[in-house]
Amino acid sequence: MIGFTCGAFDLLHAGHIVMLEESRSRCDYLIVGLQTDPTIDRPEKNKPIQSVYERFVQLDAVKYIDNIIPYDTEESLIDLLKSQHIDIRFVGEDYRDRDFTGSDLPIEVQYTSRQHSFSSSGLRKRIEENEKPH
């Protein structure tokens, strides 16, 4: 079974690793789509702090990932989903009742649990607060 998940994976953190481990435990081969910059077609998103190269290197070191495929826009994500032989797509449970790119494709969707408080936004905030003069 080939699994797929995707994201920007900026400021790779424990929550990402937990999600990747859970995803990989449900398939035989895990492909990760690495979004180069979510703000290209979704300006409301956060622009990555790390370069796509930095994020790729970090993901490449994660033992749960078998292949990383960069993509730029939501349209290119659709093309990616259609071009790979994906059996299962892993999406965070916070998307359970929401529409998301590719949800209409004939790929089984499984939701990953969010039994933790780790997030890139939270990490950004902690970094910002630590950088303030005391």
Regions found by a protein language model. Give the residues of each.
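Nucleotidyltransferase catalytic core that binds NTPs
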Residues: 1-134
